[in-house]
Amino acid sequence: MRQRLFVDRGVLVAYLALTLAACRAAPGALVPVGAAPVSREQVGEWVAATVPTEHRLHRFKWLFQDERSSAGGRGSARIAPPDSLRFDVAGPFGSGAASAAVIGDQPLWAEPPDAVKKLVPNYPLMWAMFGVARFPEPGDSLRGLTDGRVIAWQYAGATDTVAYVRTGGKDGKLTAEVRHAGKLVGRAETTLDASGAPVKARLVVPSVPAKLDLTFLSTARATFAPDIWTARRP
């Protein structure tokens, strides 16, 4: 049976403000300890609300920074619901070009082979930067809560924990956090427009430390040729 776990809105909004502030400082838990167990059906509804219903083409500027250097340029991402993504990025004058096609949390191909890992350490974090949450794995323990406008939910597996907070409205946000064996892998915060399309996104990876910023230039419906999912041949 579907569960709707409502909490006092003021409490949840205050909690969310503190949590998102933690994205910029010492990160705390994204989902409150008091969140209750929820059904896969309920989580499925929350996730489905983030998945585009049509093919989308995103164009964006990107900037990657760590303690040693920084690099940036422009890129595009083609998303075919429910879970297929092709991205292409390059620096000035085509330098450092990289491409990859992904289905869910598995790469079909990547050029160069480490194209995804060099920028994003985890596929749920990658998807979150485009405003899309991922479904839980079989056997995950699920918790969540909502006040109708703010939704927070978490999947806990044997070693990994994935958590999301989503807010609606004109300037909505999707925040995602991934932990491995309790250690923070990364946290992504994406600002959304009223239609749910991404406006800007930031990924913070504390272990490097590093951050990746995306500034979206456009989001549009698109028709994709079948060969975009096939790796280019030499």
PLM segments and residue spans:
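Acidic/charged, solvent-exposed loop-and-adjacent secondary-structure segments enriched in E/D, K/R, S/T
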Residues: P107-D140
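Sec-dependent bacterial lipoprotein signal peptides
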Residues: M1-C23
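N-terminal leader/targeting segments and the immediate start of mature chains
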Residues: C23-G72, S76, A80, L119, ...
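Residue-level recognition of conserved beta-strand positions in structured domain cores
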Residues: V89-G91, E111, V178, L203
